[in-house]
């Protein structure tokens, strides 16, 4: 099977099921969530982040993005969707949030939270059960960054490909590429 090259992650989202059930793990200020919502038009979108408060900023590599109250920003962006129930916010770690969902709930999940190996591996391993067969696990930063997360995302994704649980379908050709894998059950 050929792996597609796709220009941007926004174009990658066109591969996701429209009007389905999706989740983004690692929402930050909600910029990417807006793209996911606009392109996929999900009937349900779960947005999950730890959204640190005050001095609880574990992301010391880029603390400037955590100066604002990002959770409140996301609540304002999705105010109407939260009211009508099509968007739910969850303040939790990605792997923990995913365990709360029933199996075979999601049509797709996009991972962009902690990029270290262990948490990314936990998120992918858990997502395999939560995403329907034929659905997608996708994520950002499928690359090495030695000073930060090293090869965490690549290792976690490639291990599940080797285990036969997911198949690589596409990768973006950006400096910090996104991956798209189909769940095989």
Question: Language-model segments: which ranges?
Answer:
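S-adenosylmethionine/decaboxylated-SAM
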Residues: 3, 7-185
């Amino acid at each position: 099977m050929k792996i597609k090259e796709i220009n941007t992650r926004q174009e990658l989202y066109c591969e996701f099921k429209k009007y389905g059930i999706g989740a983004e793990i690692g929402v930050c200020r909600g910029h990417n969530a807006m793209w996911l919502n606009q392109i996929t038009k999900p009937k349900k979108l779960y947005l999950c982040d730890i959204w640190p408060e005050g001095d609880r900023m574990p992301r010391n590599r880029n603390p400037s993005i955590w100066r604002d109250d990002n959770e409140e920003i996301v609540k304002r962006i999705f105010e109407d969707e939260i009211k009508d129930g099509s968007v739910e916010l969850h303040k939790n770690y990605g792997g923990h949030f995913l365990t709360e969902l029933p199996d075979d709930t999601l049509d797709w999940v996009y991972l962009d939270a902690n990029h270290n190996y262990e948490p990314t591996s936990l998120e992918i391993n858990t997502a395999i059960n939560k995403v329907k067969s034929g659905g997608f696990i996708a994520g950002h930063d499928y690359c090495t960054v030695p000073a930060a997360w090293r090869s965490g995302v690549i290792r976690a994704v490639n291990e599940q490909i080797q285990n036969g649980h997911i198949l690589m379908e596409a990768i973006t050709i950006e400096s910090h590429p996104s991956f798209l894998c189909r769940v095989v059950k």
